[in-house]
């Protein structure tokens, strides 16, 4: 049975990262430190700009976040690729939430624009993705537009974020 709530707290996101939310072998979020949000505040199957689904998530920013120490020394800024990855994570989560099977992978995007930075003095990052299309076949494909705001100012815009869910083909690596 899939968990179909309309919001998720941090512990729920960790459960998703362990493969416990959508079933073994299905969509998972990465675990920390690559999990790029603290909560999903809203998820719907029919909302958003295109009426095909919507996800909103938040990250509480503080100067102790791992990436500020290394990117860059004496000039800390959240790498733009991490904000982009958060939006891909949200599209993959949505696909698992609506019933898609198999592990997820980011497949690309059409366009990305940065007009600001996430710095240590920012309090909160809000991520938003609006689903444009979900293709349901052997490969589940989600396409969405998204944005990131830092303290209520939109500073990233992404168009045509693409994430696919694939039937498991790779063998697990023995540890």
Swiss-Prot record:
Catalyses which reaction(s): a (3R)-hydroxyacyl-[ACP] = a (2E)-enoyl-[ACP] + H2O; (3R)-hydroxydecanoyl-[ACP] = (2E)-decenoyl-[ACP] + H2O; (2E)-decenoyl-[ACP] = (3Z)-decenoyl-[ACP]
Metabolic or biological pathway, per its Swiss-Prot or TrEMBL entry: Lipid metabolism; fatty acid biosynthesis
Key words of the record: Cytoplasm, Fatty acid biosynthesis, Fatty acid metabolism, Isomerase, Lipid biosynthesis, Lipid metabolism, Lyase
Coiled-coil spans in chain: none
Lipid biosynthesis recorded as keyword: yes
A cellular-component GO term for this protein: cytoplasm
Active site residues according to the UniProt entry: 71
Database matches in NCBIfam families: fabA, PRK05174.1
Oligomeric and partner information: Homodimer.
PANTHER family, sorted: 3-HYDROXYACYL-[ACYL-CARRIER-PROTEIN] DEHYDRATASE (PTHR30272), 3-HYDROXYDECANOYL-[ACYL-CARRIER-PROTEIN] DEHYDRATASE (PTHR30272:SF8)
Protein name: 3-hydroxydecanoyl-[acyl-carrier-protein] dehydratase
Organism: Rhodopseudomonas palustris (strain TIE-1)
């Amino acid at each position: 049975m899939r968990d179909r709530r309309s919001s998720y707290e941090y512990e729920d996101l960790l459960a998703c990262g362990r493969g416990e939310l959508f079933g073994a072998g299905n969509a998972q979020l990465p675990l920390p430190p690559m999990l790029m949000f603290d909560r999903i505040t809203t998820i719907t199957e029919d909302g958003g700009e295109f009426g095909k689904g919507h996800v909103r998530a938040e990250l509480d920013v503080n100067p102790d976040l791992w990436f500020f120490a290394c990117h860059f020394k004496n000039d800390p800024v959240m790498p733009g690729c991490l904000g982009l990855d958060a939006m891909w994570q949200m599209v993959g989560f949505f696909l698992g939430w609506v019933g898609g099977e198999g592990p997820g992978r980011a497949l690309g995007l059409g366009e990305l624009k940065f007009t600001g930075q996430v710095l240590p003095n920012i309090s909160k990052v809000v991520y938003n993705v609006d689903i444009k299309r979900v293709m349901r076949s052997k490969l589940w494909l989600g396409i969405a537009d998204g944005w990131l705001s830092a303290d209520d100012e939109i500073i990233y815009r992404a168009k045509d974020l693409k994430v696919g869910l694939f039937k498991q083909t790779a063998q697990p690596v023995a540890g």
